[in-house]
Amino acid sequence: MLENLWEVRQALPIYLLTATIGLAVSCCFTLICPHVCRLIPALTTYGKAADQLEENSLVARISVPKKWFKHFYALGLLTLLLCLHCIHSLIHNPDFLPTIPIKFLTILTRSYSIPPIAPSTAVLALLLITFHVARRLYETLFVSVYSDSRMNVFHYIVGIVHYIILPISIMCETQGVITKKEIFHVSVDDITLTQWAGAVLFWVCNWKQHQIAEQIANTRKGPRGLIRNYAYGICFGRWFNLVSCPHFLFEICIYLSLLLVIPTAYVYRFVVLFVCVNQTFAALITHSWYHKTFPKYPKTRKALIPYVL
């Protein structure tokens, strides 16, 4: 079992599991004992939660603007379009991919005689993720109103790596991509009702998250849509009456709903685990910041999950 775990072909799961554990431990330090090591909170927080950190610290000096979130989605969208182009080419020419990219994909996951993701399923999943990433890019460019808040370079690099890994985690387990034993066939008829249900749920969660992004942006805009201020405020209404970070909640739901579309995926499960841990701790840290910053912050409001957490 240990030999299988540390096999070279498990490069992506090992990276994702290591990143998840490291993130969880660091965030626990930030929440429980932030003054023990000031470097850890500096590495695990960004935006409003990081504004109170010492400006002369090394991490603060090598930080980047929070508005650079758009780089995540731009590079992620480019990677997704390249993956979709490869799949489109494989439909017409099974030998389209040269040897080097195939060897690269094979070291990212377990060795399979037949990879677990069918071509039709992979196409549906990649199209859904493309929609999600394109929507997030649109929001960062035209909806969200960013202040002068910053994020550390470590967080920036992890974000870029995440959105590049996301489509690759599906490509490296798609039949006909890393092996030539299967016919690369794509058909709508191959998609099951459960997978369609997952796709609908994925879209609904994206729609809800977009509404929340607009709601957050409107707290800094006037009646005519012009930017009024860059100050942080308390959001009210809809999901904000229940939790402090509904956008983080729906981010988790988006990734979980995709599991209904690609239930046989192996690497993607580690992506989901990383996202769940990341968004949960981000919500807890943000929730704590709200309570410290606003004395009259609603006491009944939870951080992430209504009535629970």
From Swiss-Prot:
Residue ranges crossing the lipid bilayer per the database entry: 12-32, 71-91, 114-134, 151-171, 248-268, 270-290
Cited Pfam families: Steroid_dh (PF02544)
Topology of the protein relative to the lipid bilayer: Multi-pass membrane protein
Record-linked InterPro entries: 3-oxo-5_a-steroid_4-DH_C (IPR001104), Dfg10/SRD5A3 (IPR039698)
PROSITE patterns, A to Z: S5A_REDUCTASE (PS50244)
GO biological processes: dolichol biosynthetic process; dolichol metabolic process; dolichol-linked oligosaccharide biosynthetic process; polyprenol catabolic process
GO molecular function ontology, one term from the record: polyprenal reductase activity
Main localisation: endoplasmic reticulum
EC class name: oxidoreductase
Enzyme Commission number(s) of this protein: 1.3.1.94
Reaction equations catalysed: a di-trans,poly-cis-dolichal + NADP(+) = a di-trans,poly-cis-polyprenal + NADPH + H(+)
Annotated keywords: Endoplasmic reticulum, Membrane, NADP, Oxidoreductase, Transmembrane, Transmembrane helix
Pathways involved: Protein modification; protein glycosylation
Keyword Glycosyltransferase: no
Subcellular location: Endoplasmic reticulum membrane
GO cellular component, as recorded: endoplasmic reticulum; endoplasmic reticulum membrane
Protein's UniProt keywords contain Iron: no
Similarity comment: Belongs to the steroid 5-alpha reductase family. Polyprenal reductase subfamily.
Known role: Plays a key role in early steps of protein N-linked glycosylation by being involved in the conversion of polyprenol into dolichol. Acts as a polyprenal reductase that mediates the reduction of polyprenal into dolichal in a NADP-dependent mechanism. Dolichols are required for the synthesis of dolichol-linked monosaccharides and the oligosaccharide precursor used for N-glycosylation.
PANTHER family, per database record: DFG10 PROTEIN, POLYPRENOL REDUCTASE
Name used for this protein in its record: Polyprenal reductase
The species this protein was found in: Caenorhabditis briggsae
